[in-house]
UniProtKB/Swiss-Prot annotation:
Transmembrane segments: 39-59, 86-106, 112-132, 153-173, 189-209, 216-236, 246-266
Underlying gene: uppP
GO molecular function: undecaprenyl-diphosphatase activity
Main location: membrane
UniProt xrefs under Pfam families: BacA (PF02673)
UniProt-listed Enzyme Commission number(s): 3.6.1.27
Anything else known: Bacitracin is thought to be involved in the inhibition of peptidoglycan synthesis by sequestering undecaprenyl diphosphate, thereby reducing the pool of lipid carrier available.
Protein name from the UniProt record: Undecaprenyl-diphosphatase
PANTHER family the UniProt entry points to: UNDECAPRENYL-DIPHOSPHATASE
Annotated organism of origin: Prochlorococcus marinus (strain MIT 9215)
Topological relation to the membrane, as annotated: Multi-pass membrane protein
Assigned protein family: Belongs to the UppP family.
Superkingdom of origin organism: Bacteria
Known function: Catalyzes the dephosphorylation of undecaprenyl diphosphate (UPP). Confers resistance to bacitracin.
Amino acid sequence: MEYLRFILYGLIQGLTEFLPISSTAHLKIISIFLGIDDPGSSLSATIQLGSVLAIVWYFRNDIFNFRGQSSKNILYYFLHERLLRSIFIGTIPIVLLGGSVKLFVPNFIDNVLRSNLSIALVSIVMAFFMYLADSSKRGSIDIKNHNYSDSFLIGFFQALAIFPGVSRSGITISSALISGWERRDAAKFSFLLGMPAISLAAIVEFIFSFNEFFSIGFLPLLVGLMTTFLSSLLAIDFLLRYFSSNGLKIFIIYRVIFGVVILLNL
């Protein structure tokens, strides 16, 4: 039974981390509805690592292929160096905001902002923001021709995802679309930008819950990690294919329903 719980958490994390519907909100709400324990900091850190590994594996060509390129292929090398710089710039806001929250609001996890009411309202507000993004004129900006101000702006919105119900992928994809990005590349950049953000969150969780790892055991954590890794790969692949010919409408509807259902059950 314990392993089934870890598999469930891994599935929820893997699927909802990349679909624009908020992984934190779903982990919290589904735990309450099913009457099972909160995943805890150690498990959260482990399954988040599974999502990072999935990003690295899925985009391994984008991440690693610039290494060892010949000096003749300057354009290819510059593109990937530029992409790395963009990811770095886009990560700055969440480091500043996340670090400040951890230092000055240490009980943030128990704050009213993480209540069911807050999650429901944020989910509905995010549905409206995603609607604005989906209704905006379809742009042509992509990973090859974006500028660093785009990276910082998307990173700024990513920082707001520390509030449960926002959805890191939802707010970064939406902000990119409003800025004029092409849909598929908006999702791709969102996922790549998630590598340092999710990794930093996992590291912080690990530091503050180191002793929990020994009480849970290696094998259950490995099960959660692998489940997250595999479900994350499915979610990434699905969303990139889906965005080739579709927008955010289905997720907007889902987020409204999700928020309303929570409100009706308060």
